[in-house]
Amino acid sequence: QFALMGQAFAKIVIGIKNPKVSLLNVGEEEIKGFSYIQNASETLKNLSKIINYWGYIEGDRITEGLVDVIVTDGFTGNIALKTAEGTAGFFTNSLKEALKKSIFSKLGYLLAKKSLEGFRAHMDPRKYNGAVFLGLNGIVVKSHGGTDAFGFANAIGVAYDMAKYSFIAVSYTHLRA
């Protein structure tokens, strides 16, 4: 059900015609993972006429853009999200410290400043703020508690888009099909 809801969200709100769906797992091989994940995979394979299932995806490939929807349980998903946030923070802080070490690194920063600012803007978590709660009879978007007004506005934007595209009504139609 969550794969179908995620697919509906990707189609309706993001505008992806045929979203690729994967299950988050400890490996891409069919024999890996808990039995409930293997059972979910079999179910998704059997729904190939209505869902574009691409099999398992490992945590280290989440950000590669190979698939559009990654399905997981809430516990595992939260760990994956917090790990990504922590890694991004660690990378940012380490880079800042490295660029302060010597006159040469400071000079290097000045030469790469425009590229680094573009990279920082691309990685800004506030742009992606807003976790959508799917499967409810209404629109619920949770904002990260540590965000600022810009991040909060983006979460409101997600909710607005869901309302604009009549996500609840249209997703019911997709799920019944």
Question: Where on the chain are the PLM-derived regions?
Answer:
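Glycine-rich phosphate/diphosphate-binding loop of Rossmann-like nucleotide-binding domains
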Residues: 1-55
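Glycine-rich oxoanion-binding loops at beta->alpha junctions
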Residues: 56-63
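Glycine-rich phosphate/nucleotide-binding loop
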Residues: 66-70, 74-172
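Conserved small/polar residues in nucleotide/adenosyl-binding loops
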Residues: 173-177
